[in-house]
Structure formats: C-alpha cells, structure tokens
Amino acid sequence: DYGAYVFTNADDIDTSSNNALRSRWYLAEEESIYIGYKYYETRYFDSVLDQGNASQALTGETKDGGKVWDYDNEVSYSFGYGVEGSTFSEEITDAKIDWSGETQSEVTVKVTNTGENAAKHAVQLYVSLPYTDYDKETGLEKSAIQLVGYGKTGEAKENSFEDVVLLEPGESEDVTITFTATDIYSYDVNEKHDNVTGAYILEAGDYYFATGNGAHDAVQSVLKEQYPDKMKDAEPTGTVYKEAVDSKRTLTESNGSTIQNQLTDGDLNSYNCGTEVTYLSRNDWAHTFPVGIGEITATEEM
C-alpha cells in the first residue's frame, strides 16, 4: 500500500507551505514482513500444506482477479533464480551452527560441475524456521524461507575481478558460507525480560538449511524433505540439512544496550483515528490481505 494518503483533517493540522515539512500524509505498511519473495514463497509453502487459507483469494488479490491463489500465476522467476554456463550439483557436507551467535556459523557445500562447460556457480543458502502454535496465537510472523548467505566457486583462488577461476567439468569444490545465527532470530513484541517487553527469540524446533537455484527451489527442497507425499511431482535441485534446537533462546542485549519495544507508537492502531489497520498474517492469508487503507483522522496524540 503505497501512495499519497491524506488525513481527513489535513487542512486543519497542516499549516506549512514547505512540502518536505508538511504533515498531511500517512502510510500503513499492511504487508508486514511479507515483502517480495518472503510473501510469495511463504504463501506457496502454506498453500502446499493447505493452511492459513493460503489458496483462497479475494477479488483483486490475484493477477487475474480470481478466487484461487496459485503460485505459478503469480511468479515467473523466483528471487535468486539464474542461468549459468553449465549444470551443477550441490551437497551440504558440513555444518557448524552456533545458535548463541557468539561465534560465526559455517555451512559447507560441495559443488560439482555435472555439465560439459567450465563455469562458475553461485551457492545460495536459505533457512526455514518452525512456525509454531505460539506464533499463530501471538501474531509472531515468520517467512517460510529466508536467505542466510551466499558464496561462489573460485573465490578462494581469485585475486581480482579479472582473475576468474572456473570449475571444470567433473571437478568439485567446497564453498563455505558464514553467518551469525542470531540473524535468524525473530523479534517478539511480547517477550518480557528485565522489566521491559520485546526481544529476539529462537524457538525450539527443527531448522532446515537448504540450497537451490533461488528461493523457490530452496523452499521446494525443504517441503520435499518434510512432506514427501505432498511434493511427489517436484524436482528441486537443492540440498537440505536439518538441525534441531532443543530449547528456546532469547537475545535481550546488543552492543551493551537492552533490546525492547521502542517503535510501537508507529502503529496507527495505537490511536483512536477512525479506522483499524489489518496487517497481513500467514495465519489467515485470505482475510488479512491488504485491500486498501481506510480514511484516517489525525489525533492530538499523533
């Protein structure tokens, strides 16, 4: 929902002649976290599992205005999709995950050139988080797949952009992707600690790391690992590594500062402004999908 939305009482509250300083406009980002691939791939994930009314669509919600949401009608090429000069296979051969985030985590992927041409290959690493009953009850939103990091073959041997190292047919190379595990945590506005509310949390459950030619390939790999009966016709090219987290973890401090809710007054629902904003939720895709922002009256509190 982007555009120039004007408060119903804009003329009464805005006396500035400078457009940069005027306070007559507002915007409600009803899409929540579901922007770009995080929307399309998460809704696809839920449609495969027939949850959250993911396959049900309201008028105007699909490209053709239909009543059924279908990924193939929405996306031509997924985020991260690319065409390379050869074909490659991938295999996750090693993973060292430090869930505390105190040290860097590493995932090593063995890449083999299975084609006939020498070429480079980009390795994309994604992760799928558990979407729990707690998340559904409290409105903690999570995308079904998210990019963790990426790497390329030949990088370890290259000294400059001109010094390109290609992987020859039949050859293999290990590509190691590093990341900080706390970047995978989700922000929970309800988490209480140290007499404040709001923190990053990592819930107990199974975490699936996946590679693939783009986000859709990765999410299909995760689905096929978890629900093979539902993915009989899918042929993803990625590889999957699963690691279980036994208990919940929280991140309550960063760089010496306490983590807590600080921007809750940015939510228009915090004010009695004439309408209620509904934010998109994977708990009910069809009935929370943005259909336009209602008229809003600026209050003295704003």
Which residue stretches match the model-derived regions?
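Secreted, periplasmic, or luminal enzymes acting at the cell surface/secretory milieu
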Residues: D1-E106, K110-K120, Y126-S128, Y134-T138, ...
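Intrinsically disordered, low-complexity Pro/Gly/Ser/Thr-rich segments with frequent PxxP/GP/PP motifs
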Residues: D133-V196
